[in-house]
Amino acid sequence: MASSDKAFKLDIVTPQKLFFSGEVTSVIAPGLDGLFQIMKGHAPLLAALKSGKVRLSLSDKSEDSFQIEGGFFEVSGNKAILLTEDVS
């Protein structure tokens, strides 16, 4: 499937494994000061995360969500990496 013009690459990594790697159009994550949303073209960012729900809008227009146990979120160019202790 061709990636959307609005999509960007996201990797979600735990110490044990690569949990997710793919194209998304939006990520909503639990920052220390509240929820924040990342979309393609976002300014570079490094943010600490608290435990909570992460929501993904995938490039095929489906959605997914899961719980994380804190971590960090980095955006650079059109790539984002979410590092977390655990995902469920």
Curated annotation (Swiss-Prot):
One of its GO terms (molecular function) is proton-transporting ATP synthase activity, rotational mechanism. It is a peripheral membrane protein. SUPFAM superfamilies: Epsilon subunit of F1F0-ATP synthase N-terminal domain. Keywords: ATP synthesis, Cell inner membrane, Cell membrane, CF(1), Hydrogen ion transport, Ion transport, Membrane, Transport. Its main location: membrane. InterPro entries: ATP_synth_F1_dsu/esu (IPR001469), ATP_synth_F1_dsu/esu_N (IPR020546), ATPsynth_dsu/esu_N (IPR036771). It is found in: Cell inner membrane. Disulfide bonds: none annotated. One of its GO terms (cellular component) is plasma membrane. Pfam families: ATP-synt_DE_N. Belongs to the ATPase epsilon chain family. Produces ATP from ADP in the presence of a proton gradient across the membrane. F-type ATPases have 2 components, CF(1) - the catalytic core - and CF(0) - the membrane proton channel. CF(1) has five subunits: alpha(3), beta(3), gamma(1), delta(1), epsilon(1). CF(0) has three main subunits: a, b and c. PANTHER family: ATP SYNTHASE DELTA/EPSILON CHAIN, ATP SYNTHASE EPSILON CHAIN, CHLOROPLASTIC. This is ATP synthase epsilon chain. It comes from Chlorobium limicola. The gene is atpC.
